[in-house]
């Protein structure tokens, strides 16, 4: 990516070319002490900083004046543009997704003819390129619509964040209200310019639809009245039908085809049911000027099982499945991104294959592969080494896995945390082959200590199964002969780190002495 500035490179290095972003995507500008008449691009900034560091005087007092970051800046940066390794980045080319992209384009091309595209459901596991591909196609659609002057817009909603009908409709309403306001302002500006020209020469109106200056003024007043009718929707407080009405009026203000992209659409259905999808999928029968199409993206291939048959029928007109990437495909993706993300030969030859291999084990997750590569690069920078090594990748794998565990444990419900804490206490005190009864005894005492409700042993068994599904514990059903069957439970995550996360919860952190609860195992 090149800098749009036309200023020359610094005189000290006329061969230097400029790039728009440094490793962290910032604009990197020099202060006034450099050369006030010269614009220095971000790619030059690293060199200037290093030159300034190396050019310090021999005065011993300089050592004392060195700041916290001076030593860290002395090493050569590894990254050229770290942002291309983040999930938010949409590349200009998506390897191994050509078929899915072409399928989407074939369906959406009807929007460029002014017709309503079929609704699309996109399925695939995390990190299979669903959202990136959909955004790429959407950007191409909007670019082409501008080229041919066909009004076509795509609006993106992340349903993991915007997960209720009210929030979805309010966010959409406000987006279209803002667009309408901008459209009206632009039109008024054009009419005011026409007014100005017509006052000097009435011939300016001859090739327009206006017969007089009064007609122009009337049109301006009409537009201002339209704008005043659009009221921004608050994120809470209105009846849902009023929010829907605001969205409906805003989207139908003028002719256009609108594609509403609902990412993580299953989260919306899980939280709020299918009312939102029902309303969106049926509104075309009432719209007069605009047409609406839905593009839903989901990690769950079975979420439509919970939909009303009418919604399922209209929503799933077209389905596109994104299969997991294999190791070779992940290697291609990483290679393409690394060429832009890293400087020179920063990566040793075994780094990309190892990142690809680790991610292939995680159901072909490209997002995981990119996170691994970025984290490995960050670890190498912290080590102040010139290269990213295989060891950095292995450290990154451990760090990402630990971060995942910490986040999962941190967001567990309180009862699940108590059950997990009971298992940790048993393991820390040397108890092997932990069974459900032992966990339940410790659990009861913990609940009494923090004044929490005590669930039944059957419900605690269910919570253990849920922890097993999350990969936090390993619970195996074993037969005890005439004594029946039981679950043998063990931790699948680091004990110390997991305990620290649990104790950060204010309720569990109030427990002063855990030893009596472990002793309860032998007393019950």
Swiss-Prot record:
Q: Give the protein family.
A: Belongs to the CDC6/cdc18 family.
What stretches pass through the bilayer? none
Record-given protein name: ORC1-type DNA replication protein 4
- What HAMAP family does the record tag this protein with? ORC1_type_DNA_replic_protein
Gene Ontology process terms (BP): DNA replication
Keywords from the UniProt entry: ATP-binding, DNA replication, Nucleotide-binding
Which purpose does this protein serve, as stated in its record?
Involved in regulation of DNA replication.
- Could you tell me where the Polar residues compositional bias lies? 1-23
**Species this protein is from:** Haloarcula marismortui (strain ATCC 43049 / DSM 3752 / JCM 8966 / VKM B-1809) (Halobacterium marismortui)
Top-down, what is the taxonomic lineage of the species of origin? Archaea, Methanobacteriati, Methanobacteriota, Stenosarchaea group, Halobacteria
């Amino acid at each position: 990516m090149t800098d749009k500035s036309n200023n020359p490179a610094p005189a000290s290095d006329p061969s230097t070319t400029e790039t728009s972003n440094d490793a962290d995507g910032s604009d990197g500008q020099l202060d006034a002490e450099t050369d006030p008449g010269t614009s220095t691009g971000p790619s030059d900034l690293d060199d200037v900083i290093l030159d300034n560091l190396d050019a310090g005087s021999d005065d011993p007092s300089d050592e004392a004046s060195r700041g916290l970051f001076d030593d860290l800046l002395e090493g050569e940066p590894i990254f050229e543009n770290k942002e291309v390794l983040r999930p938010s980045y949409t590349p200009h080319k998506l390897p191994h997704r050509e078929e899915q992209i072409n399928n989407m384009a074939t369906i959406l091309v009807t929007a460029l003819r002014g017709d309503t595209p079929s609704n699309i459901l996109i399925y695939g596991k995390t990190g299979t390129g669903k959202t990136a591909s959909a955004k790429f196609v959407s950007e191409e659609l909007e670019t082409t619509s501008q080229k041919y002057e066909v009004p076509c817009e795509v609006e993106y909603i992340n349903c993991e964040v915007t997960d209720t009908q009210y929030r979805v409709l309010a966010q959409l309403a406000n987006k279209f209200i803002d667009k309408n306001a901008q459209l009206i302002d632009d039109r008024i500006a054009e009419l005011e310019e026409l007014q100005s020209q017509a006052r000097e020469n009435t011939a300016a109106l001859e090739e327009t639809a206006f017969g007089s200056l009064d007609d122009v003024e009337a049109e301006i007043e009409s537009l201002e009245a339209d704008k005043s009718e659009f009221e921004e929707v608050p994120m809470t407080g209105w009846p849902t039908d009023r929010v829907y009405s605001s969205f409906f009026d805003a989207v139908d203000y003028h002719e256009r085809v609108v594609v509403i992209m609902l990412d993580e659409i299953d989260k919306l259905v899980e939280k709020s049911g299918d009312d939102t999808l029902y309303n969106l999928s049926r509104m075309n029968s009432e719209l007069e000027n605009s047409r609406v199409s839905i593009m839903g993206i989901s990690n769950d291939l079975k979420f439509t099982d919970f939909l009303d048959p009418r919604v399922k029928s209209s929503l799933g007109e077209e389905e596109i499945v994104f299969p997991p990437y294999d190791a070779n495909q992940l290697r291609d993706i990483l290679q393409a991104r690394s060429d832009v993300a890293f400087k020179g030969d920063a990566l040793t030859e075994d780094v990309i294959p190892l990142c690809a291999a680790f991610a292939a084990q995680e159901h072909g997750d490209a997002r995981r592969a990119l996170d691994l590569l970025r984290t490995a690069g960050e670890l190498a920078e912290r080590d102040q080494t010139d290269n990213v090594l295989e060891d950095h990748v292995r450290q990154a794998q451990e760090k990402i896995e630990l971060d995942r565990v910490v986040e999962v444990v941190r967001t567990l419900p309180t009862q699940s945390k108590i059950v997990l804490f009971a298992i940790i206490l048993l393991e820390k005190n040397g108890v092997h082959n932990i069974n459900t009864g032992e966990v339940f005894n410790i659990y009861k005492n913990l609940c009494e200590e923090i004044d929490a409700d005590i669930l039944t042993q059957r419900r605690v068994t269910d919570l253990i199964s849920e922890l097993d599904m999350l990969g936090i514990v390993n619970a195996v059903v074993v037969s005890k002969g005439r004594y029946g069957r039981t679950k043998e439970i063990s931790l699948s995550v680091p004990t110390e780190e997991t305990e620290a996360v649990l104790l950060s919860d204010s309720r569990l952190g109030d427990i002063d002495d855990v030893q009596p609860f472990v002793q309860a195992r032998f007393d019950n």
